[in-house]
C-alpha cells in the first residue's frame, strides 16, 4: 500500500522548520525554502504570503505541542517534574530557532511577541507550581524564595516593552 503524498503546505512547514533550525531564521529566505523543496517560489507564495506567515504557523504548532504540558497537574514525585522538564526541552529543541532568534522574530511581529511573552510566563508559572507542589509534599527542599532572580521580571521580549 502506497503512502498518500504529503501536502505541499505541510512540506513547506517541515522544510522551513528544518532550515531555520539549521541555518537560523534570519539566514533563511522563502527562496531558500522553495529551492530546498524543488518547488517554484510562486507555489510557496500560493500557500504562504511571506516568511512571517510561515513562522506564525510554526509557532502555532509549537504552542499546540506545549499547551498540554502546561495543563499538567502538580507533580507528586521529583521524577514527574524531571519528566515534564524533559518533555518541555524536547519541544523547545524541536523548535529551537524560535528561542535562538527570538529577538529578531519578535522585533518584526508584535502580535507574535505578545504570544511568546505569554507562553514564557505560562511555562514559568507551571514549573514554579510543580516545584512548589514538590516542596509542599516534602519531596523537595527550597529556600524561602525559590524563584530565580531572572524570573522576577517578565520575559525580555523587545517588542513587548
Regions found by a protein language model. Name each.
Residues 1-7:
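N-terminal intrinsically disordered/low-complexity leader segments
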Residues 11, 15, 19-53, 57:
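Helix-turn-helix
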Residues 57, 70-98, 107, 112-114, ...:
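Hydrophobic alpha-helical connector segments
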Residues 60-66:
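Short, basic, alpha-helical segments at the C-terminal edge of helix-turn-helix-like DNA-binding modules
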